[in-house]
A protein has these predicted regions:
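Regulatory and interdomain segments flanking nucleotide-handling catalytic cores
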Residues: 1-496
């Protein structure tokens, strides 16, 4: 094809990721779905592009864009990350072919995920600016995602059997549907990688029992959702500055590549480094990362690991130094192992939004954590958003969401200190306040009456715990007393 000054900027996005991963309570399928999603943009798109000649795909190692200066290239990947892929095409027909081929791959590999793409034609010369084109393309794709109705595969016919969870027709002899089989095959595949590598000589959990403190019982696990604070706005400001400073199209693309890599690799390296500091004897860590999408992280873990693990991750983020500041808010849903994962994820996501809301109300600085302990089965995200917000919350000892700060009054450190005090041992290695007493005190705080709270505080004070001249988050501490491992990063934790 002869060289032309007309190009296509194409932005790809996969829709329905969370629904796809958490569509079942079979953890093996959740793991497989996570691997499939991670592989689609990272590997399958690259494979499709490599099937065509003269396409530059190695954007991470060579930051300089070559499409405009080398007429042999027909397309070039700008970046892949955050669930998106951006490609510039010289050949418009090639753009259509790639979209068709990757869409087919998506159906073959996942069965139900949807690929959304938007293109923008532009003419290139030395005065062309990259950022306005990219921003226009992003806005167009966002509108398209809001308006589109995602197609769904055919369900079971009246004459066909169907699997009980998603209602898809059974297509395998062992009573599995196609989507179930694809996910399980992905779990066992040696070709597909985990979204985050486990620490050396360790493996991530694959079965739900791997996450339980006592395998076989109905103990709690945690679903954790962490989302970066204002990363999109930071990226937007950086790209705007590149444009305002008069940098060329190629220089702006290089800057975008560097920032994208810094976000995705920065978060990934940080989380991996935290995981390496965990002290645990067994080969299988009771953790399973499921989503790593730019600054968006979702994972499952043993319930008592959740709070210390999240606090450590958020603290590491705040101490990160780079062109972009890394900070985040987190939501934790504590649920029984049999609790529906899709609802648990929704609760964790809403908790994260509540944490972000409090961060915004307090000046938009720092990292915050919110959590919900689900005791029954009839619980939804409305139970998080519908919490009372009256001034009595402080009296009741509930300060959620908590700021992750060494100096914040009634921040997460205060909550952790209260939990540690409740878990202190007495002279004969017994609890200073037995769990039975703690449950009674917890009920007193829930009642919210002054007499009940006064009696509970007097009992705490009589055991030498706490100074009750000022209120502390005792209600939240009572809830999490059984779900906090204080030696996760200090001493060896040995489970029988």
């Amino acid at each position: 094809m002869t060289q032309t000054d007309s190009y296509l900027l194409a932005l790809y996005d996969i829709s329905g990721i969370q629904e796809y991963i958490f569509a079942t309570n079979r953890m093996k399928e959740n793991v497989g779905a996570s691997r499939i999603v991670g592989d689609l943009m990272r590997s399958q798109l690259i494979k499709v592009l490599k099937e065509h000649e003269s396409i530059k795909v190695d954007w991470q190692k060579d930051m300089e864009i070559e499409l405009f200066s080398n007429s042999e290239f027909q397309a070039e990947v700008v970046f892949i990350g955050g669930g998106n892929a951006l490609v510039i095409y010289r050949d418009h027909n090639l753009c259509q072919k790639v979209f068709k081929e990757i869409s087919i791959k998506l159906i073959e590999k996942s069965y139900t995920l949807t690929l959304i793409a938007e293109t923008l034609e532009f003419s290139y010369d030395k005065t062309t600016s990259y950022y306005p084109l990219y921003q226009e393309l992003q806005d167009t794709l966002a509108r398209k995602k809001e308006e589109m109705v995602r197609p769904k595969p055919f369900g079971a016919l009246p004459i066909s059997a169907q699997e009980h969870f998603g209602g898809f027709p059974i297509t395998y002899k062992d009573n599995r549907s196609t989507i179930q089989a694809l996910k399980e095959q992905a779990t066992e595949s040696i070709e597909l990688e985990d979204i985050i590598d486990p620490p050396p000589k360790k493996r991530w959990a694959v079965q739900i029992n791997d996450l339980k403190k006592s395998p076989g019982d109905d103990s709690y696990i945690a679903v954790i959702h962490i989302d970066g604070n204002g990363m999109g706005e930071q990226m937007k400001r950086k790209l705007q500055n590149l444009d305002k400073n008069g940098l060329s199209f190629a220089e702006q693309v290089k800057g975008h590549r560097e920032l994208s890599l810094q976000i995705s690799q920065g978060y990934k390296d940080l989380v991996q480094n935290v995981m390496k500091t965990i002290s645990f004897e067994k080969d299988i860590l009771p953790i399973r990362p499921l989503i790593m999408d730019g600054d968006d992280l979702t994972f499952l873990c043993q319930a008592d690991w959740a709070l210390p693990l999240v606090v450590e991750i958020l603290k590491r983020m705040e101490s990160y130094s780079g062109d972009l500041s890394l900070s985040a808010c987190a939501g934790i849903a504590y649920v029984h192992g049999h609790f529906p994962f899709d609802i648990a994820y929704e609760i964790a996501e809403v908790c994260c939004k509540e944490a972000k809301k409090k961060r915004s109300q307090n000046g938009g600085q720092g990292s915050y954590i919110d959590f919900q302990l689900v005791r029954g089965s009839d619980v939804s995200a409305r139970d998080v958003t519908g919490r009372p917000t009256n001034p009595n919350n402080a009296v009741l000892g509930r300060y959620r969401p908590y700021r992750v700060s060494e100096h914040e009054k009634n921040g997460v450190n205060t909550l952790i200190e209260c939990i540690k005090q409740l878990n202190e041992k007495g002279t004969e290695s017994e609890m200073r306040i037995p769990r039975t007493k703690q449950k009674l005190m917890y009920q007193a705080y829930l009642k919210g009456t002054e007499d009940a709270i006064k009696a509970a505080n007097e009992l705490l004070e009589s055991r030498g715990i706490g100074d009750f001249n000022e209120t502390k988050p005792w209600l939240d501490a009572f809830e999490l007393a059984d779900y906090y491992e204080q030696n996760l990063f200090k001493s060896r934790v040995v489970q029988q």
